[in-house]
Amino acid sequence: GAETVTKLIGNAIVAFADFPDQWQKLREDRSKIPAAIEELLRYEAPSQYQVRTTTRDVTLHGITIPADSAVLLLTASATRDERMFPDPDRLDIDRERKMGFNLAFGYGVHSCLGAALARMESRIALDALLDLLPDYDVDRAGLKRVAMSNVAGWSNVPVRKRV
């Protein structure tokens, strides 16, 4: 869980640099932090996929997946589905959440037990970042992606505080 939260915060710093109007909204109204966390989880979650095993034969779109087969669920793709999320490649902390739901922590019996803790840690971190870096730039030349297949994010996010 610690790995995913730190990657979410790094993803947030880069995403808000790409969408400074959204960072400005948070600066003006910190009550939007929980919604921002949900949108960040949709926009670029640290967990981009999940693997499940079929318990029986399943037929989807004319293709049968046999029982006991591994299935790769690309949740990162699902959260960018334009049928569920208008303008899905845009970070929008005021996004309507009635249609699409958050798959970042799994779903149903496979939901992450640490989801509430991760959300709380992320809220605390964003609140602190608003104090520490109200205006900033990301040094894109110094960005480094993690070399992990199960977690998506940055191992290095150099920032420069604007004064």
Question: What are these model-predicted stretches?
Answer:
Residues A2-V163:
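Cytochrome P450
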